[in-house]
Design a protein with these regions (language model features):
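Iron-associated oxidoreductase/ferritin-like identity signal
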Residues: 1-176
Length: 176
């Protein structure tokens, strides 16, 4: 059984993950509209990843006999000043999520909820990767902003295709 306070905070994080997923869809659609398919694909994949993070949290609450609440989310930002702006927004979002996940870890520790603390550890590791990936992409986009096709080439070379992480928590509904 998850500590009540942890379950409540995790419920808030579910909302944050769904909001991140929606924002990444908006980023992808922006890039699709500019005919930048690799940037679009990158963010469509990020959207799926964030949605799956939310579903992992839902599954944890189900497994911990806590009632998950599926929240509504605010509309994402859909217009941007230039091709770097969506990546800048994504990096800011990933840094904020890192702080939120760290706070979840703090709540689990304060509540002596060792099972929840163990669950959150995977997300901490994931956030290090997310911030690093978005930081690198932002550096490339800023450097190549005048030649977005070179950003597309960079993404093609990097080919960060998602591979299944055997240490990832299970997601509610499976990895849909």
């Amino acid at each position: 059984m998850a500590a009540q306070r942890f379950a409540e905070q995790l419920g808030e994080q579910i909302a944050n993950e769904f909001a991140a997923s929606q924002q990444y869809i908006a980023n992808a659609v922006y890039y699709d509209g500019l005919t930048l398919p690799r940037l679009a694909a990158f963010f469509y994949q990020q959207a799926v990843e964030e949605r799956n993070h939310a579903m992992m949290m839902v599954q944890y609450l189900l497994d911990a006999d806590a009632e998950p609440v599926i929240p509504g989310v605010a509309a994402p930002q859909t217009s941007f000043s230039d091709i770097a702006a969506p990546v800048e927004l994504a990096l800011t979002q990933e840094r904020r999520v890192s702080d939120q996940i760290a706070a979840l870890m703090g709540v689990a520790r304060e509540e002596n909820d060792y099972l929840s603390e163990q669950f959150v550890q995977w997300f901490l590791k994931e956030q290090v990767e997310e911030v690093a990936s978005m930081s690198s992409l932002l550096a490339v986009v800023r450097r190549l902003q005048a030649t977005p096709d070179f950003v597309e080439d960079y993404l093609a070379r990097e080919d960060r295709a998602a591979s299944a992480d055997p240490t990832a928590p299970p997601a509610a509904g499976g990895a849909l």
